[in-house]
Protein backbone atom coordinates (compact mmCIF):
# COMPACT_ATOMS: atom_id res chain seq x y z
CA UNK A 1 0.00 0.00 0.00
CA UNK A 2 1.13 3.54 -0.69
CA UNK A 3 1.94 5.75 2.28
CA UNK A 4 -0.53 8.66 2.57
CA UNK A 5 0.93 11.72 0.94
CA UNK A 6 3.63 9.71 -0.79
CA UNK A 7 3.92 9.44 -4.55
CA UNK A 8 5.95 6.59 -5.96
CA UNK A 9 6.45 5.30 -9.47
CA UNK A 10 7.14 1.92 -11.00
CA UNK A 11 7.77 2.26 -14.69
CA UNK A 12 4.85 4.25 -16.06
CA UNK A 13 2.71 3.47 -12.98
CA UNK A 14 2.42 6.20 -10.36
CA UNK A 15 0.96 5.28 -6.97
CA UNK A 16 -0.23 7.98 -4.56
CA UNK A 17 -1.49 7.25 -1.06
CA UNK A 18 -4.15 9.27 0.74
CA UNK A 19 -4.96 9.47 4.43
CA UNK A 20 -8.11 10.43 6.29
CA UNK A 21 -8.31 14.20 6.89
CA UNK A 22 -7.48 14.93 10.51
CA UNK A 23 -10.83 16.68 10.97
CA UNK A 24 -12.55 13.33 10.32
CA UNK A 25 -10.35 11.21 12.57
CA UNK A 26 -13.29 10.32 14.82
CA UNK A 27 -16.00 10.33 12.16
CA UNK A 28 -18.16 7.49 10.91
CA UNK A 29 -16.09 5.14 8.68
CA UNK A 30 -18.17 6.10 5.63
CA UNK A 31 -17.42 9.79 6.18
CA UNK A 32 -13.73 8.98 6.56
CA UNK A 33 -13.87 7.26 3.19
CA UNK A 34 -15.61 10.25 1.63
CA UNK A 35 -12.89 12.50 3.03
CA UNK A 36 -10.31 10.47 1.12
CA UNK A 37 -12.50 10.43 -2.00
CA UNK A 38 -12.74 14.22 -2.01
CA UNK A 39 -8.95 14.51 -2.00
CA UNK A 40 -8.64 12.03 -4.85
CA UNK A 41 -11.28 13.79 -6.96
CA UNK A 42 -9.55 17.12 -6.40
CA UNK A 43 -6.22 15.72 -7.62
CA UNK A 44 -7.41 13.63 -10.56
CA UNK A 45 -5.35 14.20 -13.69
CA UNK A 46 -6.22 11.22 -15.85
CA UNK A 47 -7.97 10.19 -19.04
CA UNK A 48 -10.10 7.56 -17.27
CA UNK A 49 -11.13 7.09 -13.63
CA UNK A 50 -11.43 3.43 -12.60
CA UNK A 51 -13.06 2.78 -9.22
CA UNK A 52 -13.40 -0.50 -7.33
CA UNK A 53 -16.33 -0.84 -4.88
CA UNK A 54 -18.12 1.98 -3.04
CA UNK A 55 -14.92 3.02 -1.26
CA UNK A 56 -13.72 4.80 -4.39
CA UNK A 57 -16.99 5.27 -6.28
CA UNK A 58 -17.57 8.78 -4.95
CA UNK A 59 -14.07 9.86 -6.01
CA UNK A 60 -14.68 8.56 -9.53
CA UNK A 61 -18.13 10.11 -9.81
CA UNK A 62 -16.91 13.49 -8.54
CA UNK A 63 -14.01 13.38 -10.99
CA UNK A 64 -16.49 12.73 -13.78
CA UNK A 65 -18.63 15.71 -12.76
CA UNK A 66 -15.70 18.03 -12.02
CA UNK A 67 -13.38 17.23 -14.87
CA UNK A 68 -15.47 15.28 -17.38
CA UNK A 69 -13.31 12.21 -16.74
CA UNK A 70 -14.96 9.00 -18.03
CA UNK A 71 -15.79 6.66 -15.14
CA UNK A 72 -15.30 2.89 -15.15
CA UNK A 73 -16.36 0.86 -12.11
CA UNK A 74 -15.40 -2.73 -11.34
CA UNK A 75 -18.04 -4.34 -9.15
CA UNK A 76 -16.76 -6.84 -6.60
CA UNK A 77 -19.81 -6.58 -4.33
CA UNK A 78 -22.95 -4.48 -3.99
CA UNK A 79 -24.23 -2.63 -0.94
CA UNK A 80 -27.90 -3.68 -1.37
CA UNK A 81 -26.78 -7.31 -1.05
CA UNK A 82 -24.73 -6.68 2.11
CA UNK A 83 -27.21 -5.51 4.77
CA UNK A 84 -24.90 -6.78 7.53
CA UNK A 85 -22.62 -3.83 6.73
CA UNK A 86 -24.97 -1.71 8.83
CA UNK A 87 -23.52 -3.55 11.84
CA UNK A 88 -20.12 -2.13 10.92
CA UNK A 89 -21.07 1.29 9.51
CA UNK A 90 -24.27 2.19 11.36
CA UNK A 91 -25.90 5.08 9.54
CA UNK A 92 -22.85 5.15 7.30
CA UNK A 93 -24.40 2.21 5.44
CA UNK A 94 -26.97 4.67 4.06
CA UNK A 95 -24.09 6.82 2.81
CA UNK A 96 -22.17 3.95 1.20
CA UNK A 97 -25.38 2.77 -0.49
CA UNK A 98 -26.11 6.27 -1.77
CA UNK A 99 -22.58 6.78 -3.12
CA UNK A 100 -22.59 3.42 -4.87
CA UNK A 101 -26.01 3.91 -6.48
CA UNK A 102 -25.22 7.38 -7.85
CA UNK A 103 -21.84 6.30 -9.20
CA UNK A 104 -23.16 3.17 -10.90
CA UNK A 105 -26.07 4.96 -12.52
CA UNK A 106 -23.75 7.60 -13.99
CA UNK A 107 -20.77 5.39 -14.90
CA UNK A 108 -19.66 5.08 -18.50
CA UNK A 109 -18.90 1.39 -18.04
CA UNK A 110 -19.45 -1.13 -15.24
CA UNK A 111 -17.37 -4.31 -15.09
CA UNK A 112 -18.87 -7.31 -13.31
CA UNK A 113 -16.50 -10.03 -12.06
CA UNK A 114 -18.97 -12.80 -12.97
CA UNK A 115 -22.16 -13.39 -14.92
CA UNK A 116 -24.09 -13.67 -11.68
CA UNK A 117 -22.65 -10.36 -10.56
CA UNK A 118 -23.89 -8.71 -13.76
CA UNK A 119 -27.40 -9.98 -13.03
CA UNK A 120 -27.18 -8.59 -9.49
CA UNK A 121 -26.04 -5.18 -10.75
CA UNK A 122 -28.97 -4.87 -13.13
CA UNK A 123 -31.40 -6.06 -10.45
CA UNK A 124 -30.07 -3.59 -7.89
CA UNK A 125 -29.85 -0.65 -10.29
CA UNK A 126 -32.57 -0.99 -12.95
CA UNK A 127 -31.91 2.54 -14.23
CA UNK A 128 -28.48 1.42 -15.43
CA UNK A 129 -28.21 0.75 -19.17
CA UNK A 130 -27.53 -3.03 -19.57
CA UNK A 131 -25.26 -2.32 -22.54
CA UNK A 132 -22.87 -0.54 -20.20
CA UNK A 133 -22.41 -3.61 -17.98
CA UNK A 134 -19.83 -6.16 -19.14
CA UNK A 135 -18.27 -9.25 -17.56
CA UNK A 136 -14.52 -9.56 -16.92
CA UNK A 137 -13.91 -12.53 -14.65
CA UNK A 138 -11.55 -12.47 -11.72
CA UNK A 139 -8.42 -14.48 -12.33
CA UNK A 140 -5.19 -15.62 -10.73
CA UNK A 141 -1.64 -16.36 -11.87
CA UNK A 142 -1.52 -20.16 -11.89
CA UNK A 143 2.25 -20.35 -11.48
CA UNK A 144 1.90 -18.73 -8.04
CA UNK A 145 0.14 -21.89 -6.82
CA UNK A 146 2.50 -24.60 -7.99
CA UNK A 147 3.18 -27.46 -5.57
CA UNK A 148 6.00 -26.37 -3.23
CA UNK A 149 9.22 -28.37 -3.25
CA UNK A 150 9.86 -30.62 -0.25
CA UNK A 151 12.41 -28.15 1.11
CA UNK A 152 10.25 -25.07 0.52
CA UNK A 153 10.30 -22.82 3.63
CA UNK A 154 6.54 -22.41 3.35
CA UNK A 155 6.01 -25.86 4.89
CA UNK A 156 7.25 -24.44 8.21
CA UNK A 157 3.73 -23.18 8.87
CA UNK A 158 2.68 -26.73 9.79
CA UNK A 159 5.27 -27.01 12.55
CA UNK A 160 4.75 -23.47 13.81
CA UNK A 161 1.04 -24.01 14.36
CA UNK A 162 1.27 -27.71 15.26
CA UNK A 163 -0.81 -28.82 12.27
CA UNK A 164 -0.70 -32.60 11.86
CA UNK A 165 -0.19 -33.40 8.17
CA UNK A 166 -1.20 -37.02 8.71
CA UNK A 167 -4.80 -36.07 9.59
CA UNK A 168 -7.62 -35.28 7.16
CA UNK A 169 -7.78 -31.49 7.24
CA UNK A 170 -10.31 -28.83 6.26
CA UNK A 171 -9.13 -25.28 5.54
CA UNK A 172 -10.91 -21.93 5.76
CA UNK A 173 -9.32 -18.66 4.62
CA UNK A 174 -11.13 -15.35 4.99
CA UNK A 175 -11.93 -12.23 6.95
CA UNK A 176 -14.01 -12.33 10.11
CA UNK A 177 -17.24 -10.93 8.74
CA UNK A 178 -20.87 -11.97 8.29
CA UNK A 179 -20.29 -12.09 4.54
CA UNK A 180 -17.58 -14.75 4.77
CA UNK A 181 -19.78 -16.90 7.00
CA UNK A 182 -17.25 -17.79 9.70
CA UNK A 183 -19.75 -17.54 12.61
CA UNK A 184 -22.02 -20.02 10.82
CA UNK A 185 -19.13 -22.34 10.00
CA UNK A 186 -18.13 -22.52 13.67
CA UNK A 187 -21.65 -23.69 14.51
CA UNK A 188 -21.65 -26.29 11.72
CA UNK A 189 -18.27 -27.74 12.73
CA UNK A 190 -19.89 -29.24 15.85
CA UNK A 191 -21.58 -31.70 13.47
CA UNK A 192 -18.50 -33.20 11.80
CA UNK A 193 -16.25 -35.99 13.03
CA UNK A 194 -13.75 -35.01 15.71
CA UNK A 195 -11.13 -36.94 13.75
CA UNK A 196 -11.13 -34.23 11.10
CA UNK A 197 -8.63 -31.45 11.73
CA UNK A 198 -9.79 -27.91 10.95
CA UNK A 199 -7.50 -24.97 10.17
CA UNK A 200 -8.99 -21.46 10.21
CA UNK A 201 -6.96 -18.63 8.67
CA UNK A 202 -9.18 -15.80 9.85
CA UNK A 203 -8.45 -12.23 10.85
CA UNK A 204 -9.35 -8.57 10.21
CA UNK A 205 -12.74 -8.58 11.97
CA UNK A 206 -15.31 -6.07 10.77
CA UNK A 207 -16.23 -5.03 14.31
CA UNK A 208 -15.12 -5.72 17.90
CA UNK A 209 -18.49 -7.39 18.44
CA UNK A 210 -18.07 -10.01 15.72
CA UNK A 211 -14.46 -10.54 16.84
CA UNK A 212 -15.70 -11.40 20.33
CA UNK A 213 -18.50 -13.57 18.92
CA UNK A 214 -16.02 -15.63 16.90
CA UNK A 215 -13.57 -15.85 19.80
CA UNK A 216 -16.31 -17.23 22.08
CA UNK A 217 -17.58 -19.68 19.45
CA UNK A 218 -14.05 -20.90 18.75
CA UNK A 219 -13.34 -21.48 22.44
CA UNK A 220 -16.54 -23.50 22.82
CA UNK A 221 -15.76 -25.55 19.72
CA UNK A 222 -12.18 -26.16 20.81
CA UNK A 223 -13.39 -27.38 24.20
CA UNK A 224 -16.03 -29.70 22.76
CA UNK A 225 -14.19 -31.25 19.83
CA UNK A 226 -10.60 -30.00 19.77
CA UNK A 227 -8.54 -30.67 16.66
CA UNK A 228 -8.99 -27.08 15.48
CA UNK A 229 -6.31 -24.46 14.81
CA UNK A 230 -6.93 -20.72 14.45
CA UNK A 231 -4.32 -18.66 12.59
CA UNK A 232 -5.07 -14.96 13.05
CA UNK A 233 -2.03 -13.52 11.27
CA UNK A 234 -1.96 -12.90 7.53
CA UNK A 235 0.33 -15.62 6.22
CA UNK A 236 2.95 -14.87 3.57
CA UNK A 237 2.08 -16.35 0.18
CA UNK A 238 4.61 -19.26 0.35
CA UNK A 239 3.13 -20.45 3.66
CA UNK A 240 -0.48 -20.11 2.52
CA UNK A 241 0.39 -21.98 -0.67
CA UNK A 242 1.97 -24.81 1.34
CA UNK A 243 -1.05 -24.89 3.64
CA UNK A 244 -3.44 -25.18 0.71
CA UNK A 245 -1.37 -27.98 -0.81
CA UNK A 246 -1.16 -29.76 2.53
CA UNK A 247 -4.89 -29.79 3.37
CA UNK A 248 -7.62 -32.02 1.95
CA UNK A 249 -10.54 -29.69 1.26
CA UNK A 250 -11.33 -25.98 1.28
CA UNK A 251 -14.43 -24.60 3.02
CA UNK A 252 -16.23 -21.53 1.66
CA UNK A 253 -19.26 -20.77 3.87
CA UNK A 254 -19.78 -17.29 2.41
CA UNK A 255 -23.35 -16.06 2.21
CA UNK A 256 -22.38 -13.61 -0.55
CA UNK A 257 -19.45 -14.21 -2.91
CA UNK A 258 -19.73 -12.78 -6.46
CA UNK A 259 -16.49 -14.54 -7.46
CA UNK A 260 -14.20 -15.39 -4.57
CA UNK A 261 -10.49 -15.27 -5.33
CA UNK A 262 -9.78 -17.66 -2.44
CA UNK A 263 -11.88 -20.32 -4.17
CA UNK A 264 -9.88 -19.95 -7.38
CA UNK A 265 -6.64 -20.15 -5.43
CA UNK A 266 -7.76 -23.30 -3.62
CA UNK A 267 -8.77 -24.96 -6.88
CA UNK A 268 -5.42 -23.99 -8.41
CA UNK A 269 -3.81 -25.96 -5.57
CA UNK A 270 -5.95 -28.97 -6.39
CA UNK A 271 -8.24 -28.61 -3.38
CA UNK A 272 -11.92 -29.52 -3.66
CA UNK A 273 -14.00 -26.51 -2.63
Q: Residue spans of the language-model regions?
A:
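N-terminal strand-loop element at the rim of the active site
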Residues: 1-30
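Nucleotide-sugar donor phosphate/pyrophosphate-binding loop at the beta->alpha transition
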Residues: 69-72, 80-102, 119
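Carbohydrate-associated surface elements
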Residues: 116, 139
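A short helix/loop element that forms part of the nucleotide-sugar donor recognition site in Leloir-type
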Residues: 146-163
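Nucleotide-activated donor-binding/catalytic signature segment of Leloir-type glycosyltransferases, i.e.
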Residues: 167, 200-202, 211-234, 238
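A conserved mid-protein helix/loop that constitutes part of the nucleotide-sugar donor-binding site
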Residues: 168-172, 177-191, 212
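Short alpha-helical donor nucleotide-sugar binding micro-motif in glycosyltransferases
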Residues: 241-247
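Aromatic "clamp/platform" in nucleotide-sugar-dependent glycosyltransferases that forms part
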Residues: 255
Amino acid sequence: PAIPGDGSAKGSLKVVGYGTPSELADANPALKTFGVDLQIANDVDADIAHAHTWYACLAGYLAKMLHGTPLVITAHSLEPFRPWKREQLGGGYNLSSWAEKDAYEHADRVIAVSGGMREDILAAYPNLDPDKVVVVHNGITMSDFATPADDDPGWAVFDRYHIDRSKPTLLFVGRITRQKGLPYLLKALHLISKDIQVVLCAGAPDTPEIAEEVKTAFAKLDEERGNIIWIEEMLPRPELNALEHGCDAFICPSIYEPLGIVNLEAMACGLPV
